Amino acid sequence: MKRSDFMLAGQQDRERYIVRPEKQIPLTMLVPGSESHLVSTKEFTVSFLTMKAGSVFDVHSHPQSQCMIVLEGKCDEIIDGKIYSVSAGDVLYLPANVPHGAFIEEDCRVIDVFCPCREDYMQKFVEQHPDSVTYFRTV
């Protein structure tokens, strides 16, 4: 395989496959003190989440599997009735339907990946940004 065997993608091609969430997608409030840039298809949702110290995610469950990558900060995750302290560099896996929640100890940035997509998050996006584009929904 050689680079010269391929054409350089144009801007229209790029827009079909690539998005810069922090520049192109408005923040959606998930819970008070926690906002996210959401990228979604039918197969997955990626949440670029910023959580303020003192934020709380009540214990809940959902039918999606979840992988959380902690980029900055620290939080206490409640998983199946136990508290797990996680911080920058940790990767957390939550199988579908496992009860979980979180206490945000200090400002924290994470990337959450959900499979399949979080329709409830996309509904929040649409409610908060009715005139915005929902990236990748038709890819």
Which residues are covered by each model-predicted region?
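A short, N-terminal "cap"/entry segment at the start of jelly-roll beta-barrel domains
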Residues: M1-E43, E127-V139
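Conserved short histidine dyad/triad with adjacent acidic residue
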Residues: P32, V46-S61
